[in-house]
């Protein structure tokens, strides 16, 4: 038998499919693209273009950089498909890609610039990833162990617009008609509670989160004129007693921050707090059951290694299991944000 016949198919090379380093180089240099995108947001390049300052010279003057650097940045943004250009001429006009126009122009009601910049402060820590994996300093809450009010304010300034979008999606996906009290675990800015109580008359909500976060949550609740519907409870939901008699529990976008034992603990507490017939919705970054992806969930799990929590990525089947073990029935995985978030829900028997 020839060597080629013995080799695994994935390792067999032909002249047409010869292995090279292109894929690996692209990964190694991916932070260059991140830096270009973040610089464009910080400099308000996309906003300048949307307002008609759409040539290299006009962008340079508007955002306060040299024409040479404007040319460098705009060329990269075109290659990244964030911008289009009319022609190859030096005085070509540029235009924003549709998603850029919607989410990265400052006067858009869906402006997500702070979310794009959300992970920038983590760059230095990721540069130390191998060392942090070798010598972890483990804390249950990881990066949130020493969270301050100012940390919470910066965090939710970055995540609020995305959180409100997810909250609107939740309230479109789930019928909470007739429900009276929702417990929002790790509810952050209160987005899910604000939108749900606005959507479903008669529903009130409690946002349970760390003490510094609830200070900031109150600011968002007041800004949305929801203080008569949404209150806060300061605490750590792995330790703090839950209010009883709730008929909806939501835990959203904090799944990878916790290890299985803590998720089981929290889900068990939620089950005990719910009235018979009540429901729980756990929304998070979940792995497929074959553990091959999606990448987003895998990276959020890795992120916990960077910041020293005990959390990791969970599969959809594992999350279903946490609810079923607690006693929930009819547990099912529902699509939420494909490739990013799943919604796992179940009901307490009546």
Feature annotation, model-predicted:
Residues 2-84, 99, 185-350:
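Alpha-helical subdomain
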Residues 10-14, 21-43, 47-53, 61-62, ...:
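Conserved Class I S-adenosyl-L-methionine-dependent methyltransferase catalytic core
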